[in-house]
Amino acid sequence: MIRIGHGFDVHKFGGVGPLTIGGEKIDYPQGFLAHSDGDVAIHALCDAILGALAMGDIGKHFPDTASEYENIDSRILLRHVVSLAKEQGYVLGNGDVTIVAQAPKMLPHIQAMRSNLASDLNCELSQINVKATTTEKLGFEGRKEGISSHAVVIMNKESMSKTNA
């Protein structure tokens, strides 16, 4: 069986940088206001995986009221979500992440983000895409108040993924 999921996340800028996006530290004067490290790309990806498997959302699994998740590296959260999917017999077919940001520029960091995500997802680099866009200076992203991210995933039943490999 194939399952499709979509995720979305947004965080406002605040405090001091760097930013962490896609598991990559990006030099920027501001950081994110968030309970965890605020990695919008990974949070959207976690939500997409959880949504595909009808397992709720990131807030259900990692509530912002729980002190153990304060300032946590979101890659740890992603690896946990991947293990939950594996317990249900699912693996990533492919994933596509879109980062919406006026600044900083993402292009210099995209390949490192893809490598980080592929490692945490236990998949080939060709199974995960990361891209970035601006809002042409419109909205909160355009005013450089924060960053948002969307993610879409296809999750395959593990036995299906082995026969198609």
Curated annotation (Swiss-Prot):
Q: Which residues bind a divalent metal cation?
A: 9, 11, 43
Any one Gene Ontology BP term: terpenoid biosynthetic process
Q: In which pathway does it act?
A: Isoprenoid biosynthesis; isopentenyl diphosphate biosynthesis via DXP pathway; isopentenyl diphosphate from 1-deoxy-D-xylulose 5-phosphate: step 4/6
Query: What's the record's note on cofactor binding?
Result: Binds 1 divalent metal cation per subunit.
Q: Which cofactor does it need?
A: a divalent metal cation
CDD domains attached to this UniProt entry = MECDP_synthase
Pfam families xrefs: YgbB
Which reactions does this protein catalyse?
A: 4-CDP-2-C-methyl-D-erythritol 2-phosphate = 2-C-methyl-D-erythritol 2,4-cyclic diphosphate + CMP
A GO term for molecular function: metal ion binding
Q: Which residues does the UniProt site feature Transition state stabilizer point to? A: 35, 134
Question: Which InterPro entries would you find in this protein's record?
Answer: MECDP_synthase, MECDP_synthase_CS, MECDP_synthase_sf
Q: Which UniProt keywords apply?
A: Isoprene biosynthesis, Lyase, Metal-binding
- Tell me the SUPFAM superfamilies matching this sequence: IpsF-like
What EC number(s) does its UniProt record assign? 4.6.1.12
Q: Which PROSITE patterns match?
A: ISPF (PS01350)
Give residues annotated as binding 4-CDP-2-C-methyl-D-erythritol 2-phosphate.
9-11, 35-36, 57-59, 101-107, 133-136, 140, 143
Q: What does this protein do?
A: Involved in the biosynthesis of isopentenyl diphosphate (IPP) and dimethylallyl diphosphate (DMAPP), two major building blocks of isoprenoid compounds. Catalyzes the conversion of 4-diphosphocytidyl-2-C-methyl-D-erythritol 2-phosphate (CDP-ME2P) to 2-C-methyl-D-erythritol 2,4-cyclodiphosphate (ME-CPP) with a corresponding release of cytidine 5-monophosphate (CMP).
What does the sequence similarity comment in the record state about its family? Belongs to the IspF family.
Subunit text: Homotrimer.
The name on file for this protein is 2-C-methyl-D-erythritol 2,4-cyclodiphosphate synthase
Organism placement in taxonomy: Bacteria, Pseudomonadati, Pseudomonadota, Gammaproteobacteria, Alteromonadales
